[in-house]
């Protein structure tokens, strides 16, 4: 959700690797390090599986905390996460992350993708993304695609590290929808929807 020109979400999206502080979007900053000093948390004993009926409340909660609702506007239409193909990462009874997908234009579209801050940097996001790619392959879909707002540099980096390439930029789409450019990650104005694609099946 965007209010008063800034992205308003009920919980921080990122965790500071220096002091462990949970960071709202506008307060987060990026830094460059060598691979040896890239912060990594302890390995988690999680599993990735298809969501079950009993996961509904946990899915609603992570959607609410990540974006404030379960209906997501992406790729020019509105998707309902609760009606999507949902994969969850869990450790015991705790939900660590969610990737929600839907078939769109003959490809598998990532509708919602979120990992709780305390579980980031521990392989959860990568495992969810690979599971989604596996889902696309099992359905003989040609590709998996995702969309990122121009301000979300960490997610843009993450997707490209996982074999996605930029295929289209809907310039000004997000700003036009709101009537102004909201303030997102690290204070960057939110204007464009960057669409990425990763081939799955030949």
Language-model features: locations:
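Short cysteine-rich clusters marking metal-coordination/redox-active sites
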Residues: 16, 31-34
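Conserved N-terminal entry element of GNAT/NAT acetyltransferase domains
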Residues: 42-54, 194, 200-202
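Acetyl-CoA-dependent GNAT
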Residues: 46, 50-118, 129-130
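Conserved GNAT acetyl-CoA-binding A-motif
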Residues: 136-149
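Conserved active-site alpha-helix within GNAT-family acetyltransferase domains
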Residues: 126, 150-186
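Flanking scaffold residues of small Cys/His-coordinated metal-binding clusters
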Residues: 10-11, 26-29
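Short Cys/His-rich metal-coordination motifs, predominantly Zn2+-binding knuckles/fingers
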Residues: 19, 37
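Conserved acetyl-CoA-binding loop-helix of GNAT-fold acetyltransferases
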Residues: 121-134, 161
């Amino acid at each position: 959700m965007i209010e008063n020109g800034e992205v308003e979400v009920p919980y921080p999206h990122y965790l500071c690797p220096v002091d462990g502080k949970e960071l709202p979007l506008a307060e987060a900053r990026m830094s460059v390090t060598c691979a040896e000093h890239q912060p990594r948390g302890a390995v988690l004993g999680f599993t990735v599986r298809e969501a079950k009926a009993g996961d509904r409340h946990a899915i609603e909660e992570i959607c609410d905390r990540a974006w404030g609702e379960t209906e997501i506007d992406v790729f020019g239409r509105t998707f309902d996460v609760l009606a999507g193909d949902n994969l969850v990462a869990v450790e015991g009874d705790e939900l660590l992350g969610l990737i929600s997908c839907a078939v769109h234009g003959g490809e598998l579209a990532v509708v919602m993708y979120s990992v709780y801050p305390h579980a980031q940097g521990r392989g959860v996001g990568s495992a969810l993304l690979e599971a989604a790619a596996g889902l696309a392959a099992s359905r003989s879909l040609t590709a998996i695609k995702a969309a990122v707002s121009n301000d979300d540099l960490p997610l843009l980096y993450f997707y490209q590290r996982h074999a996605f390439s930029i295929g289209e930029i809907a310039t000004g789409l997000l700003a036009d929808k709101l009537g102004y450019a909201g303030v997102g990650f690290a204070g960057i104005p939110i204007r464009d929807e960057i669409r990425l694609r990763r081939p799955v099946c030949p």
